[in-house]
């Protein structure tokens, strides 16, 4: 698929290499087929230059979301793309800063410039909930509805794979509660060459405790409004968090795909932000979870004010979240 008609042209396969022409900034997924899709690659051409920002936690953090065009606060071009945990292929986020329950992902087009849809797997069977199907069907969001009570993974519960994004032991901690394992780039890691999905502790400085917070004064955010105080006046469809004493970065609230219904939660666009890490989440709360390295919201599903931020929580692997890469 391509994010705009005519974005990709001249696709050829020769001597084991794929060549193509790209007309301008945007996103695309190019696949090689032998009847069925054998493999696919995400092509990302942002408007702004990708760069790294140093952080208090010691990681060099990418300056925009994976798949974003730039990182301008209050601009939908900052949303980027959404990923089910462990999958390499993305889904489009909302086309507008805010949305409704009827909002679907931004339009995408096939090689003939016809609009195509992100579809979902069966909600009554897990027959297609396997890695081979995921690779062969990059535009299908895999639902966990049929196994929701036993696993929140998009893979069948007995096929769950903690190593998909390169950090199978990433949940292990020491006696001072520090994460022991940082992981490494994996075969299915969606980040560009030289970058990878971050470990669980990458944004622990974003709250005073390093954990769940519901008081804005406990968020390590930039004073965007310039009024000398931390408040919702500093929120612009996302927060600008301080990565270090000298660097901050905007993290947009691009919402997410719900893993059970395998559809974009469009009404939460601009209100909820969720970002994946590379580590599995301990199974004592629920099976099929992974670490979210950043989750925040300013309203609940009923539209009531509910301001929270968590830099290390659990999420369902079937949900599709944003990704903020770090330098390898």
Role assignments for model-derived ranges:
Residues 1-185, 281, 317-319, 327-328:
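Short, compositionally biased
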Residues 29, 68, 151-328:
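C-terminal, surface-exposed recognition/capping segments
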């Amino acid at each position: 698929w391509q994010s705009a008609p005519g974005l990709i042209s001249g696709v050829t396969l020769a001597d084991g290499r794929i060549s193509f022409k790209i007309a301008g900034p945007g996103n695309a997924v190019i696949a090689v087929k032998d009847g069925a899709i054998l493999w696919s690659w995400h092509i990302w051409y942002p408007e702004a230059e990708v760069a790294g920002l140093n952080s208090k936690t010691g990681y060099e953090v990418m300056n925009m979301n994976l798949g974003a065009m730039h990182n301008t606060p209050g601009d939908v071009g900052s949303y980027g793309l959404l990923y089910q945990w462990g999958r390499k292929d993305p889904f489009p986020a909302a086309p507008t800063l805010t949305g409704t329950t009827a909002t679907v992902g931004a339009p995408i087009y096939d090689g003939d410039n016809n609009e195509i849809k992100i579809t979902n797997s069966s909600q009554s069977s897990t027959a297609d909930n396997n890695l081979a199907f995921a690779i062969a069907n990059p535009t299908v969001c895999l639902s966990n509805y049929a196994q929701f009570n036993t696993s929140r993974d998009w893979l069948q519960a007995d096929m769950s794979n903690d190593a998909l994004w390169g950090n199978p032991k990433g949940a292990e901690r020491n006696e001072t509660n520090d994460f022991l394992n940082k992981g490494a780039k994996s075969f299915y890691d969606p980040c560009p060459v030289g970058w990878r999905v971050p470990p669980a502790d990458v944004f622990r400085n974003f709250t005073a405790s390093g954990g769940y917070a519901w008081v804005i004064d406990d968020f390590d955010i930039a004073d965007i409004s310039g009024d000398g105080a931390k408040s919702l006046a500093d929120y612009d469809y996302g927060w600008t968090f301080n990565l270090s004493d000298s660097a901050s970065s905007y993290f947009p609230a691009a919402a997410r795909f719900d893993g059970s219904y395998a559809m974009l939660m469009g009404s939460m666009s601009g209100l909820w932000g969720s970002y994946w890490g590379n580590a599995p989440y301990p199974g004592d709360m629920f099976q099929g979870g992974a670490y979210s390295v950043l989750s925040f919201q300013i309203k609940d599903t009923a539209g009531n004010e509910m301001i929270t931020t968590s830099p290390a929580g659990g999420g369902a692997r079937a949900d599709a979240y944003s990704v903020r890469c770090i330098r390898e």
